[in-house]
C-alpha cells in the first residue's frame, strides 16, 4: 500500500512540476524536457524488460493459453470502448456524435484512460499468502497478456489517426517479427539480470529505437520517419531471457527507485494546461480540445465515473472459467482493477 501511495504522490508531484517548470526555466525548458524524456524512455524500457521476464509459460500447452489470451484482450479492450462511448455521448454535444474526427480523437483519448494491469499486484497477492492459489497463477497469465494487448492495440489506433502509410506497414512487420522471435526464443538466453545490467539493456533498446527514427528521418524527412516505441522491443528482450530472479535488498531498492523516477517523469511529461484556453494552440484545431473548459469539480466527477467504467470493463473475466466459484472469478476480475506502470507509459507515448 505504501508503494502505491508513493507512485500516486510522485505522479502528482510530476504533474505539478510540469506546470511550474516551463515558466521557471524559460528558454532552457525544451532542452530540460528532452533530457527528461530520454530518462523516461529508459525507465519505461527497464520496466518492460522486467514485465517480459515474468512471461513464463509452457509452450507445449499453448492451446490452453488461447482462451486466456482472448479473455485478456477483451479485458483490455472493453474498458477502452466503454470510456470512448462515455467521452463521445456524455462529454460532447449531440452534433458531434456522428463526427468522424470526434470518434478518432476520443478513441485515442480513451485508450490512455483505460487501465492496464500492474506488476505490483503480484507482490500484493504474495503478501496475502495467495502465491499458490489458482487466482494468483491465472492472474499472472492474464496480466501479462493484458499488457501485451495494450501494446498491440496501439497499432490500429495509429492507422486510424494517421492513415495507411507505408511506414506503418514496416512497423507492423517489425512487431510480428519481434513477437515471433520472442515466442521462438522464449527463456533461451542466459544474460545477466542484475538491475544495472537490465538498465544497460534499457539504454541499448532506447538507443536502437532512436537510431531507427533518426535514420528514417534523415532519408525520408519527419513525415516519413519510422517510430518504434520501446514498449515491445523491451518486452521481447525480457521474454528471451532465461529468467533468473536476483533477490536482494539492493535489487529491490534499485527497481523501486527506477519505477518511482518513472512515475515522476510521466507526470512531468504532461503538457502545460493551467492558464490555457480551448482556443489556445493546437487545441482549437481538435473537436475535443475546442470544447469549453470544465470546472475542477466537474472534472473530478467525470474522473470518478470513468474509473467506475474502467473497473466495470475489467469484470469481463468473471463471465468465464465457469469451473471455478463465482467468488474466485470475482476476485480474479477485481485483481485486474489495479493500474500499472505500463499504463503510465502508454499515457506518455500519447
Model region roles, listed by residue range:
Residues 20-28, 53-61, 183-187, 212-221, ...:
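Transmembrane helix-loop junctions in multi-pass membrane proteins
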Residues 148-151, 155-261:
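Core mid-bundle transmembrane helix pairs that form the ion/substrate translocation pathway
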Residues 1-57, 63-79, 193-204, 223-233, ...:
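Helical membrane-embedded segments and adjacent short helical loop/helix-boundary regions
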Residues 21-23, 61-130, 264, 272-350:
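Transmembrane alpha-helices that form the ion-translocation and gating core
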Residues 70, 131-145, 152, 156, ...:
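Membrane-interface alpha-helices at helix entry/exit sites of multi-pass transporters
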Residues 32-48, 100-117, 164-177, 222-236, ...:
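Structural signature of hydrophobic alpha-helical transmembrane segments
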Residues 40-51, 78-86, 105, 113-123, ...:
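Membrane-embedded alpha-helical core segments of multi-pass
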